[in-house]
């Protein structure tokens, strides 16, 4: 499908996830009246794409804006550079302009829950554990078929490779929106292991790398191409990453703890993915990208009784130069490896 009419084009990775669907719904709900919107749904499987588009189309019809919203899709895997290269070819062919890229990448490699630790931590350190759970067990040493750390490639390197290859489509006002996390912290990254191969919490480490890579690339993108990069976080919400390890009783208990945490004042407890999508969509639809705080991480928040809010967190970006240089080196190497493919 080649899109010629004037429309705001938004590409969402991980669009079939709970948060991805919520972002799509909020884009439909909050777009300007009579404005045209093209949502490009991406996933690794055709089944997930079909479900996502069917859900979003039904939402657009229910909101009586069906004719004003178009859908397209791409199938690719952020843990496969050949797949990424194919997606880049398709994006360049279909779209002369991309207004926003939303990277909702969420490769975590969870393999279970440490239940004794969970019970101890939730009993003795409830606030810190509910916001930053230490009981989730992640696989260590997982590499992609390309030989990179899986979480690093899927959440950090693959997305940045795409951004740097799509500067022509994004230039002069395009936005890149990163879904970071409140769990991001410098303690989860060792600069001697940037690919997170030996990291016991590669998901949290990848979110920290997203933050510092943004700090490295954001000024360059803006100065050289007029592209704006933003860090956002969706707070805490129900997602499938942990739910698959819960039975009906533990899932109910999780919901109770989330609502209790919100009642005692933890505004990060969005719970509903739709509330988590608040800030990413607000940034997407903002008409003055230069006015937004790009040096902060902008977070979706919810008050005790469900009122939506926004939070801006000033971050420390130690390691930005090292991480940025490492990504740059990888980008150069993969451009050389992929140069003989169609582009």
UniProtKB/Swiss-Prot annotation:
GO terms for molecular function: 3-beta-hydroxysteroid 3-dehydrogenase (NADP+) activity. Signal peptide: none annotated. InterPro entries: Ergosterol_Biosynth_ERG27, NAD(P)-bd_dom_sf, SDR_fam. Its EC number is 1.1.1.270. One of its GO terms (cellular component) is endoplasmic reticulum membrane. GO terms for biological process: ergosterol biosynthetic process. NADP(+) binds at residues 19, 42, 203, 207, 239. The active site is at residues 180, 203, 207. SUPFAM superfamilies: NAD(P)-binding Rossmann-fold domains. It catalyses: a 3beta-hydroxysteroid + NADP(+) = a 3-oxosteroid + NADPH + H(+). Pathway: Steroid biosynthesis; zymosterol biosynthesis; zymosterol from lanosterol: step 5/6. Keywords: Lipid biosynthesis, Lipid metabolism, NADP, Oxidoreductase, Steroid biosynthesis. Belongs to the short-chain dehydrogenases/reductases (SDR) family. ERG27 subfamily. This is 3-keto-steroid reductase.
């Amino acid at each position: 499908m080649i899109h010629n009419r004037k429309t705001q084009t938004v590409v969402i990775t991980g669009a079939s996830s709970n948060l991805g669907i919520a972002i799509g719904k909020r884009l439909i709900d909050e777009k300007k009246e009579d404005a045209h919107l093209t949502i490009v749904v991406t996933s690794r499987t055709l089944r997930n794409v079909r479900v996502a588009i069917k859900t979003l189309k039904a939402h657009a019809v229910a909101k009586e804006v069906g004719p004003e919203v178009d859908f397209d899709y791409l199938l690719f895997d952020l843990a496969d550079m050949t797949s990424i290269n194919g997606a880049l070819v398709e994006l360049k062919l279909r779209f002369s302009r991309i207004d926003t890229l939303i990277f909702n990448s969420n490769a975590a490699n969870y393999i279970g829950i440490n239940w004794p630790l969970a019970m101890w931590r939730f009993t003795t350190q409830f606030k810190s554990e509910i916001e930053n759970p230490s009981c989730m067990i992640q696989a260590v040493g997982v590499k992609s078929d390309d030989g990179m750390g899986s979480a690093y490639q899927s959440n950090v390197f693959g997305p940045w490779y795409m951004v740097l290859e799509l500067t022509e489509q994004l230039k002069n006002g395009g936005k890149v929106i990163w879904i970071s996390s409140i769990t991001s912290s410098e303690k989860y990254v060792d600069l001697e292991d940037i690919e997170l191969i030996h990291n016991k919490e590669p998901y949290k480490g990848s979110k920290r790398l997203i933050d510092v890579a943004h700090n490295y690339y954001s000024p360059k993108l803006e100065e050289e191409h007029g592209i704006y990069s933003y860090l956002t976080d969706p707070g805490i919400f129900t997602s499938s990453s942990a739910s698959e390890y819960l039975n009906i009783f533990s899932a109910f208990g999780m919901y109770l703890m989330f609502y209790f945490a919100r009642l005692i004042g933890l505004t990060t407890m969005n719970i509903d993915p739709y509330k988590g999508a608040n800030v990413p969509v607000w940034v997407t639809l903002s008409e003055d990208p230069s006015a937004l705080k790009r040096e902060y991480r902008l977070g979706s928040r919810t008050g005790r009784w469900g009122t939506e809010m926004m939070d801006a967190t000033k971050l420390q970006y130690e390691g930005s130069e090292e991480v940025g240089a490492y990504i740059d080196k990888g980008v150069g190497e993969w451009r050389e490896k992929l140069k003989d493919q169609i582009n």
